[in-house]
Structures are given as C-alpha cells and as structure tokens.
Amino acid sequence: MQRRDFIKLAGGATLIPIAPSVFGGQISHSKWNSYRLTYQINLPTKGKRALLWLPLPDTTDTYYQFTQGSVWNGNAKKAKFHNIPKTNFPVFHAEWRGSGPRKVTVSSIVKTRNRSVDLQNFFEKKNRIIPSSIKRFLLPTRHAPLNGIVRMTASSITKAANANTPLEKAHAIYNWVVDNAHRDQTARGCGRGDIKYMLERNNLGGKSADLNTLFVGLARASGIPARNQYGIRI
C-alpha cells in the first residue's frame, strides 16, 4: 500500500463526523454529475425456485451524492425494493417459481460530485456529544470485537503516536494500517474482515473488507465512530 495524504481523505472515507456543520466552511464542492446504473440479471433456468438480492446505490442524501430512484422490469413472480433490516442499505429482491427463463433489469439514477475536506485548520470542540444515530458506529461486530487484542493494538498505536484527540488518533491508526497491512491477492472474494483473527496471527494481508475493517475496528476501539463504506466505480 502507498501512503496517502490523510488530511485529504479523512472526510470522505470511513470516519463519521460528529457534527457535519463543523466542516461546513471547510468543504469544497464541485458540479453535479448524473449516472444511470443498469443491472441486467439472467439466472440459470433450472430448479424449482430462485431468489435474488441486488445491492443498490445508497439512498441517504448527502452533500455529495443522492439517488433519484430505481425501477425494474422482468419476469419475476415477486419483486420489491426495500432496506436490509436494521440498516439504511437498499436492495432489490426478486423471486422466481418454477424452472424457465429468469430475467430482470434494474436501473438507478444517481447524482454525485467530488468533495474534499481541508482539516488543516480544523478545531475540535471539547465535550463533544455523539448523536444517537451515530452511536451504532461505535459498536463491536462478530468479526471486529472491540476488546482484547483489538483494543490493546489500538491503544498501543495511539500511545506510540502521542495522539490525544479523535482526529490525531484516527490519523495515527490510518498511518499504522498503511505501514503494516498489505493487499493479499490470494484472499477469497473481498476478504472476511475478521480483524481479531488477523491480529492474533500477526498476518495483516487481505483485501478490501479486511483492510477497511482493520481501520474501522481500531478506530471504534479508540472511541471514534467509523463504518465500512463500499462503492461502485462509475
């Protein structure tokens, strides 16, 4: 991995800003770009039943992205747009019964624009309050527990860097991941994201889910709200 400029990336990757208004005067905007994303699905014809779950563009409106809706057509017996339970992640779900052709086309219109956040002059307020909607990004997960070796590693990283504020700690963790982790082409799929397993075996090689979760887990263990956020190149 190559070291990148954390100051340019911190506002747009996995850290969750506590108060977006704090960054209002530091966010640079550019023109909007429109895209139509079309997925054409043709499933195997054999079998009595077929199910499809298709991830869709994030429907949460932000200052850099929003969706104008999705439509579908095809021969599915049942189909619907909905969010994965307990999340804001939208998916398209379709069902076919009986053998035969199973086709569906799903289109989404998305508007995006480039963004950057200049943190050089960022001033962090004391006694910050974390909104309830953000607190879930401080919770442990099955593959990213926040105790044991994960917490010990996070603590050693921030202490070695003499990092005290959340921004300083995030910067230190980011640099540590860049310096110590690497992409492993032999990992299956996008990786498992099991950072406890990675740290216990001192093997920090992996793919996107592994490396992203490593940063997110260490950040959460340091009291910094963070989440995994994946996207599609357009």
Where are these regions (language model features)?
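N-terminal export signals
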Residues: 5-24
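Acidic low-complexity segments
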Residues: 82-84, 103-184, 188-202
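C-terminal segment of N-terminal export signals and the immediately downstream linker at the start
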Residues: 20-42, 47
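Hydrophobic/aromatic-rich core segments of domains that either
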Residues: 211-234
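Surface-exposed beta-strand/loop patches in extracellular or lumenal glycoproteins
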Residues: 44-60
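Short, hydrophobic/aromatic-enriched beta-strand segments in well-ordered soluble domains
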Residues: 37-41, 52-54, 102-114
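Solvent-exposed beta-strand/loop surfaces of large extracellular or lumenal domains
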Residues: 61-94
